[in-house]
UniProtKB/Swiss-Prot annotation:
Family indicated by similarity: Belongs to the conotoxin T superfamily.
Residues making up the propeptide: 20-48
Location in the cell: Secreted
Full protein name: Conotoxin mr5.1a
InterPro entries: T-conotoxin
Amino acid sequence: MRCVPVFVILLLLIASAPSVDARLKTKDDMPLPSSHANIKRTLQIHRNKRCCPGWELCCEWDEW
C-alpha cells in the first residue's frame, strides 16, 4: 500500500516528460543524414566506378 503513491507520482512524472526526437538536428532544425546513409552513399560511389586501372578483378566485381 505504501508503493501506490510512489507509483502514481512516477506515472505522472513520466507522462509529463517532454518527448525526445531521436533524429539529429542542425541549428536550422533540418535533420542530419545518418551514418548508415553516409556509408550507403560511399558504397554506391565506389560501386558505380568503372574499372580500376591495372586491376582486372575490380572490373569483374562491378559486373556482379
